[in-house]
Amino acid sequence: MDVVDSLLVNGSNITPPCELGLENETLFCLDQPRPSKEWQPAVQILLYSLIFLLSVLGNTLVITVLIRNKRMRTVTNIFLLSLAVSDLMLCLFCMPFNLIPNLLKDFIFGSAVCKTTTYFMGTSVSVSTFNLVAISLERYGAICKPLQSRVWQTKSHALKVIAATWCLSFTIMTPYPIYSNLVPFTKNNNQTANMCRFLLPNDVMQQSWHTFLLLILFLIPGIVMMVAYGLISLELYQGIKFEASQKKSAKERKPSTTSSGKYEDSDGCYLQKTRPPRKLELRQLSTGSSSRANRIRSNSSAANLMAKKRVIRMLIVIVVLFFLCWMPIFSANAWRAYDTASAERRLSGTPISFILLLSYTSSCVNPIIYCFMNKRFRLGFMATFPCCPNPGPPGARGEVGEEEEGGTTGASLSRFSYSHMSASVPPQ
């Protein structure tokens, strides 16, 4: 079986007989065929089923919430909707057509399905990757260049970018339906079976294609995401440093705001004069109000710091998971393109199956990272499905759809958020 082919892997979990040879593609037996352990198919079925169900459920919920909730149709959420569609497409067109032929040792779905699945598989991976890049650039503009980015951070612009992403992906992946075909082979029990293979006319084209995919779907997107999220983290870290210095300065100014240790003004700008006793209650009331305002400012600052630290941690998780999910499969693709014999010998069977499973995991974790970790989305989910318990009272701060420009996590994180002090409590 070779349904996932060169985009997710140009290698087969089925080992053809030694005598079978094709022009421009070498198929061979392993030197020492590895016996299939009885527990491996069961583990494969269990893991594939788990990832499949989580991916379908998660992405379907994301699509449902974002479509049914008009107030959540923000710029960022439009990109998240496109990401959910592409991830759902990746799950539906890849996992069943990889697992079933792998278990049966035969691609039973026919030539038309072979061409269709490889095409939609390639398109879904491409769209998903481009969406992740678009989200990172959109967040960079919102946080690091808020004034300049307001010109192009509109829903209409987001829709144009998404349309261009899908059209570009469908165009790039046109070689798949053209060069994907069924390749017959004889199994060890002398029965004839088929593999779905993506075979370009010659080795140079095959290697060039793998290198091209490695660049546009892994290396370049990975670098762009690292740079964008790195700059965002630096911006937020500077905000954390600024707020820490403001807090330290406020503490240092506090002792100088007293007069003979009797009276203290809340803003520390002047010394309060002694007044007649009849106004003592008014001064005490003013001091109490100032204390409450100070507590609000302190809580606001602490909440801001915690929110920014959470964002930085989430951005690190995004980059790590992207490389963790996709590096093994793209490395295997490149290895097989330039050293087919060695790659087949070491990766055939269970190793490549679990490498593929790791790449499919991205379609399951993306909804969790980008949506379910966002309080606005969780509130939108509760509003879309009223049968679920509401996490807070009606009309509470942070209503559905009120997404701030700072990021998908709910923190107010614009470039100049640390250039002035505010007594308002930040959104969560």
Curated annotation (Swiss-Prot):
Compartment annotation: Cell membrane
Predominant cellular place of this UniProt entry's protein: membrane
Membrane topology (Cytoplasmic): 68-77, 138-157, 235-313, 374-428
Keywords carried by this UniProt record: Cell membrane, Disulfide bond, G-protein coupled receptor, Glycoprotein, Lipoprotein, Membrane, Palmitate, Receptor, Transducer, Transmembrane, Transmembrane helix
Chloroplast among keywords: no
Transmembrane annotation, as ranges: 42-67, 78-104, 116-137, 158-178, 211-234, 314-334, 350-373
SMART domains registered for this protein in UniProt: 7TM_GPCR_Srsx
Lipidation (S-palmitoyl cysteine): 387
One record GO biological process: neuron migration
InterPro entries listed in its UniProt record: Cholcskin_rcpt, Cholcy_rcpt_A, CholecystokininA_recpt_N, CholecystokininA_recpt_N_sf, GPCR_Rhodpsn, GPCR_Rhodpsn_7TM
GO molecular function: cholecystokinin receptor activity; peptide hormone binding
Extracellular side: 1-41, 105-115, 179-210, 335-349
Residue ranges, compositional bias (Polar residues): 411-422
Annotated glycosylation sites: 10, 24, 190
Region annotation Disordered: where it falls in the sequence: 248-272, 394-428
Lineage: superkingdom: Eukaryota
Keyword Lipoprotein: yes
Disulfide-linked positions: 18-29, 114-196
Membrane topology field: Multi-pass membrane protein
Assigned GO CC terms: cytosol; membrane; nucleoplasm; plasma membrane
Similarity field: Belongs to the G-protein coupled receptor 1 family.
Protein name: Cholecystokinin receptor type A
Record gene name: CCKAR
